[in-house]
Amino acid sequence: MSAIAQNPWLMVLAIFIINVCYVTFLTMRTILTLKGYRYVAAVVSFMEVLVYVVGLGLVMSSLDQIQNIFAYALGFSVGIIVGMKIEEKLALGYTVVNVTSSEYELDLPNELRNLGYGVTHYEAFGRDGSRMVMQILTPRKYELKLMDTVKNLDPKAFIIAYEPRNIHGGFWVKGVRKRKLKAYEPEQLEVVVDHEEIVGGSSNEQKV
């Protein structure tokens, strides 16, 4: 600690790193608490307080220089970004994506089920007539992949995504096949759909 205190640039670096770590844990703990992951949030809060006790005393006793104040503020802002990025990478929980489409002939519900998603669909009516509405459950890490998939199948589809607070009952979570979701790529979707159509067509011909 004495070596750091004697070198102003080491002090700036120490203040920046300590505050990045502290605010990263603080941001993650806040997000996890809001999402209901209480036990994970408790572990993160332990790390947060540990950094606070060990390092923040050094930081707060060295804010008499302008460069230290700047390092403290910069570390705070970077810590928020880092904490949010880590939480995004962890992608805990599920996302519900609502899709409204007028293209009944595409059979989007079954196409998405074949790709591994849990889908509930029903008919609705808008200004321009009948529409098909789908509620699609997906792990958060595959949310963008699902949206790209829907856009490839129906570029005119109306899409809304939100994160459910709690999930209980039904077959949604069991209906999500994570291995299937991981196996395909949206840009290869046309090949997958064509293959399904070929297989379905050949089986129908054999039955006839």
Curated annotation (Swiss-Prot):
One of its GO terms (cellular component) is plasma membrane. It is found in: Cell membrane. Belongs to the UPF0316 family. This is UPF0316 protein SERP1448. The keyword Transcription does not apply. Keywords: Cell membrane, Membrane, Transmembrane, Transmembrane helix. It comes from the Bacteria. Disulfide bonds: none annotated. It is a multi-pass membrane protein. PANTHER family: UPF0316 PROTEIN YEBE. Its main location: membrane. The chain crosses the membrane at residues 8-28, 40-60, 66-86. CDD domains: YitT_C_like_1.
